[in-house]
């Protein structure tokens, strides 16, 4: 199953969703975020992962208002 990486956050007072691509597996999708963090010298204090009933995985990475969503795109 492929997964779309989405970043949910705020720019000013406006909620935004930025899509960062579709990957073949959940692991590849999550690694794409880790690689971006490494490239940009960012290290989260923690990653809290939650799985939703629809198969979406989301990461809380300590920013309080920004999250990564890994959305399943079908078989």
Predicted regions and their residues:
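Short aromatic-glycine-(Arg/Gly/Cys) micro-motifs in beta-strand/loop hairpins
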Residues: 1-17, 47, 60-61
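A short, charged, amphipathic alpha-helix used as a generic interaction element across diverse proteins
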Residues: 13, 24-45
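Short, mixed-charge low-complexity intrinsically disordered segments
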Residues: 36-75
